[in-house]
Amino acid sequence: MIQDSEFFRMEGVPITKEEIRAVSIGKLNLDPEDIVLDIGCGSGGMSVEIAKRSKFVYSIDNSEDAKNTTSINLKKFKIENCEVFLGDAKDLISKFDFNKVFIGGTQNIEQILEILKEKKVEKVVANTIVLENGVKIISKFEELGYNVDFVNVSVSYGKKISSGHIMLSKNPITIITATLK
């Protein structure tokens, strides 16, 4: 995994943290022939890591800053098998052929999941920090007939203080994996 500090960052554009990227990549179970859609690509952390392990990545974000940040990171890490698009994922999904999806943003999530089911996407991994979004995503996947697995991951980082060391935790992330039956 590439360390978070190596990525170009822009104020207000989120990045999936290194340890969460590692678990999410593991859940995607990527193959060199996979074509992956990254919805809500943010700073492009997942796009870069996925592209290193798959045939091609389509990255989408509705923020121009996110699109630009992802593009900068793709160039920085010499990733050529990824294309970034600006817009609403629900309107763009039908333009692409892919077999796996990573979702880092939850805008219009229920409509997006319905479209993914219509396209018979074999595996979807969705990350969320908001509990209600996690429940909504899990319920929708179950309604659509997917096998669903989910895990909540908490990461703490060590920090030296004058009297020793402490662990500082980040927000826990729910990682939802849905596999087509």
Swiss-Prot record:
Catalytic EC class: transferase
EC code: 2.1.1.196
Keywords: Cobalamin biosynthesis, Methyltransferase, S-adenosyl-L-methionine, Transferase
Pfam families noted in UniProt: Methyltransf_31
Binding sites annotated in the UniProt record for S-adenosyl-L-methionine: 16, 40-44, 61, 89
Catalysed transformations (reactions): Co-precorrin-6B + S-adenosyl-L-methionine = Co-precorrin-7 + S-adenosyl-L-homocysteine + CO2
CDD domains, A to Z: AdoMet_MTases (cd02440)
InterPro entries reported for this sequence: CbiT (IPR023475), Cbl_synth_MTase_CbiT (IPR014008), Cobalamin_biosynth_MTase (IPR050714), Methyltranfer_dom (IPR025714), SAM-dependent_MTases_sf (IPR029063)
GO function terms (MF aspect): cobalt-precorrin-6B C5-methyltransferase activity; protein methyltransferase activity
Pathway(s) served: Cofactor biosynthesis; adenosylcobalamin biosynthesis; cob(II)yrinate a,c-diamide from sirohydrochlorin (anaerobic route): step 8/10
GO biological process: anaerobic cobalamin biosynthetic process; methylation
UniProt family annotation: Belongs to the methyltransferase superfamily. Archaeal-type CbiT family.
Family annotation (PANTHER family): COBALT-PRECORRIN-6B C(15)-METHYLTRANSFERASE (DECARBOXYLATING), COBALT-PRECORRIN-7 C(5)-METHYLTRANSFERASE
Protein name: Probable cobalt-precorrin-6B C(15)-methyltransferase (decarboxylating)
Annotated source species: Methanococcus maripaludis (strain C6 / ATCC BAA-1332)
Gene: cbiT
